[in-house]
Amino acid sequence: MKFDAIIGNPPYQMNIGEKKDNYGIPLYNQFVDIARQIRPQFITMITPSRWFTGGRGLDQFRQSMLGDTHIRAIFDYVDSKDCFPTVDISGGVSYFLWDAKHKTNCQFTNHFGGNANTLPRKLDEFNIFVRNNGALSLIHKVKAMSKTMLNAQISPQTPFGFVSTYRGTAQPETDPTCVMLKSSGDASYVLREDIKKNQQWVDLHKVIFSKATCEHAGTPDRNGQYRVLSALALLQPQCVCTQSYLVAGAYTTAEEADNLLTYLKTKFVRYLILQTITSQDLSPEKFMFVPLQDFTSKSDINWSATVEEIDKQLYEKYGVDEAERSLIENTIKEM
């Protein structure tokens, strides 16, 4: 049997278990894969957009989709309610047109805030898909001028081996190797020997941030703006953290840690992180477009300036034009 066209709104996920902390396994990718295997003339399906940059178990599917030159068009809705008014789907939704005879760039249309922007795109330009057409020129400038990105030093989840629910003792132990454990709740105390990962960071000055984004999987506030990063903090020597946080950097001097913390507060950095987000959790890969800086006193950035002034220095350093500056300033909240 031959199909000329396959059209569908496949089931998005299968929930595993009955407890509130259980999760869903994506299903829509399997329907898309089967449809492509059938090889009709056309396929069009609407799915969550989370596959652009993340999603549990979607890495292989994402690479397959980004490398598929038969995808003629994608129509993306950052806010799923623009497509389904009564349904909130984290990361938005999108539908695509697959054409067996098409073998060139994809016409990608992004819908956001009542506006639509269309651009011919090479889907596999990066190992994730940047849904914001307006951000591409800035990303190209930054990558052309940068040897190392910040993701190279961001810790993976559970940086010291303690899950989010783990708690140590309420009071410090008499053992001199006792260190403080920061969690999303109150601080507690653990022995150094209980730290199973990254012991080399324990005695350094660290910058940590919450693994959860401030927004609901990339959904803006009512003004169309984002904060992106929620909790940011300095973690002193002899302090570690649970899985609730990731470590952005660990330094021998407090000055470098302070300057990294300031850098993460800039609109420039948070705008670049935003381009990788379609889910609520942050990971090292979300910092793939953020250039690593010199955080010492020898830096070409004056870190003693205000965050607003540092943003201006970064705009100058990376040749950010007025249109790009306006987009950043209007998209990202002050922090």
Residue spans of the language-model regions?
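Hydrophobic beta-strand segment of the Class I
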Residues: I6-I7
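Conserved Class I SAM-dependent methyltransferase catalytic core
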Residues: M14-D82, S94-W98, L260
